[in-house]
Amino acid sequence: MEIFKPINEKKAKGKVKKIFSEIKKTRKITKIPNFWKSIAHNPPLLERTWNSLKAIMKDGALDAVTKELIYVAVSITNSCGYCTRSHTFAAKKKGATDQMIKEMIDVVGIANQNNKLVEAYQVEVDKIYK
């Protein structure tokens, strides 16, 4: 259960209302997701987070689908169900296929498993990797 009730989009004012409008336009959505409505209790945090997300998630050396898949991978590893679902949705909207998502999940699984094995066995890093 949330700590703070998400801000009602229709009751948003000032900077929050402006950012909500930009989020909807940029993400091509009609309703503000609960994440944004929840952090809107702290308008400077809302603004900073939105600006950072826009800057980082835009196309660059990595395309938008790849960035969304990375976001999903990190969210799975961090056990953030909300972020996993919302960014899987975003990845699909940007062109990710079910097969791409399945393969990414396989990579997350094997990476997490092998990371834990390396730590458990205290494997020394090979000279070639240093």
Where are these regions (language model features)?
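Hydrophobic alpha-helical segments
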Residues: 1-130
